[in-house]
Curated annotation (Swiss-Prot):
Keywords: Acetylation, Metal-binding, NADP, Oxidoreductase, Zinc. This is NADP-dependent alcohol dehydrogenase. It comes from Pelophylax perezi. It holds the Pfam family ADH_N. One of its GO terms (cellular component) is cytosol. The keyword Oxidoreductase applies. Zn(2+) 2 binds at residues 98, 101, 104, 112. Belongs to the zinc-containing alcohol dehydrogenase family. Class-IV subfamily. The gene is ADH8.
Amino acid sequence: MCTAGKDITCKAAVAWEPHKPLSLETITVAPPKAHEVRIKILASGICGSDSSVLKEIIPSKFPVILGHEAVGVVESIGAGVTCVKPGDKVIPLFVPQCGSCRACKSSNSNFCEKNDMGAKTGLMADMTSRFTCRGKPIYNLVGTSTFTEYTVVADIAVAKIDPKAPLESCLIGCGFATGYGAAVNTAKVTPGSTCAVFGLGGVGFSAIVGCKAAGASRIIGVGTHKDKFPKAIELGATECLNPKDYDKPIYEVICEKTNGGVDYAVECAGRIETMMNALQSTYCGSGVTVVLGLASPNERLPLDPLLLLTGRSLKGSVFGGFKGEEVSRLVDDYMKKKINVNFLVSTKLTLDQINKAFELLSSGQGVRSIMIY
């Protein structure tokens, strides 16, 4: 039965309030308006950022449908949409690409000004929602909201991919691209260099893969879960360190082991202390640190300017510096086995098991859970 132009009733995991489990609900998804795309979600990953919203580390309005790392099929399109058509396989983009703002026109940034990461409206461009539940509008997350069987996104926030792409390609929508790109695009790791990756979760593992792909000769994985060390070594880390094993700051240990510090550090843990350790673990004259983790909005880096004055640099990175137009190439590379994302998948669940996925994430078990719809 054709559903284009009609409301769709489907299942979704709704976060009614912070610090509470998600609730599996029946919601209504309105048809896409002009320059919008309605997508049938096939699979979605569970990212630490989703958990950070629930913990109020990332500000959001409630009730909200979380999720931003997915793959799906276009169900219908609104007026004026030319980039995709019904039936196309796509990845929603939490960092859109309008093509006309300063960031989109620059080769130095991928942070499109039409993103909803800063505005925090939780609404579409016309300031309304496409989701309703129990008679109430439900907010979206960064313009994507993938913990639902159907979602609506702007046409600038969708990447068409190979129709044969496996469901695991959903991880290119955030986790893999974020870590991998931080190494190859943002840090610009060079052949023969030394690297340290702080935080051995999905993003950290992807950063290790990126460092290895860029030709780093030494990659130090840093984490407190020793059960993650074998996977880190398998992916390219040359050694792993647990800060709890030392009676001195881990940056001092790393500097002692690397003749004054590594060339590049990537921070994926989201803790102020870890960010400072990452920065101080780099060589004073030229070290580059990339911060990916999200700390509490009430916390600030206690930064001594002297750490930067000598030549270090501190950078941030979102979605690994990739623009939306590059996502299809990443999927193609994955299908050609030039890159691999399968190592991220530790558990496959269904939408009604979503709270179990969050429990696994919070406990540090596994790497990444994906939900198959």
